[in-house]
Amino acid sequence: MKVLLTGATGFLGKYVINELKSNNYKVIAFGRNEKIGKTLVDENVEFYKGDIENLDDLFRASEGCSAVIHAAALSTVWGKWENFYNINVLGTKNIIRLCEEKKLKLVFVSSPSIYAGAKDQLDVREDEAPEENNLNFYIKSKIMAEKLIRSSSLNYMIIRPRGLFGIGDTSIIPRLLDLNKKIGIPLFADGKQKVDITCVENVAYALRLALENNEYLGGIYNITNDEPIEFKEILTLFFNEIGTKGKYLKWNYNLIFPLVSFMERVYKFFRIEKEPPLTKYTLYLMRYSQTLNIDKAKKELGYYPKISVIEGVKKYVEHSRKNDRNS
């Protein structure tokens, strides 16, 4: 089976490629990063440099494909609405048109950030997603993209993977470790809020399961490691493996929130493109619990995480040490 993978040059992309190749799929890696594309070609992966905003690129790249895994997205907490709309909404429209005309199955990588809000949320199920959430443009665009897919005539599946981490991550863990070195990590509620994180290999595995499952077409699935853990405990796992101590800053949410909210308004008013030091979305992530229920993925996809959080942490730290020694 031949599969078109958008976002192939991103963090998740290489893991999906490995998962599919090791299960005898032929992958067309579609992305914009030529440098990473060249490394994929060196590893005998067919790479197509293209843009999901360009329908012709998609039609040419998908020749002979039976399915599409759509992982490409602009996924940041700040930016211009038109950029999120063009990539995450119009880009998805192009994917839908491609799949409808060529009769391809679609597996869409969405985001559980659509659940985000100013409250604790435990054991959240897929049908608890709001119809609208304007906390940031990324969330708004992902909800719009999901609606487009759900209203289409496609054979589709949607997954919402939570807090991806692993080797190659340039977002969650590196930022926290860097923050710890510089000033310390802000803590609310003594870091006892519960969160889910997910080994990126498990997400790639879940995508393959969704690709292969034709019994529950139209299904939407939360994906996590199924190991809810306190925020401070995650940090402690990493620090213990690294052999360092965590530096923590106790912040008062009631004092910080008005400042962050005001700062966002100022940035929006003056159309400042640079991301503010802190956003309401990031603040909610740090302050409130959010864990996801994955019973549906277990029952319908047969998804059970292959790699535990502690295994993922050990692999990440070991790889980082090797890189440090070689640099």
Ranges and model annotations:
Residues 209-275, 294, 314-317, 325:
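Mid/C-terminal beta-alpha module of Rossmann-like enzyme folds, strongest
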Residues 3-23:
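N-terminal Rossmann NAD(P)H-binding glycine-rich loop of SDR-like oxidoreductase domains
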Residues 133-159:
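Active-site Tyr-X1-5-Lys
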Residues 140, 144, 169-175, 189-211, ...:
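Substrate-positioning beta->alpha
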Residues 115, 157-175:
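Flexible, glycine-rich beta-alpha linker
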Residues 292-300, 304-327:
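Amphipathic terminal alpha-helices
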Residues 90-137:
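Conserved Rossmann-fold NAD(P)-dependent oxidoreductase catalytic core, especially the SDR/UDP-sugar
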Residues 49-87, 98:
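NAD(P)H-binding glycine-rich loop region in Rossmannoid oxidoreductase-like domains
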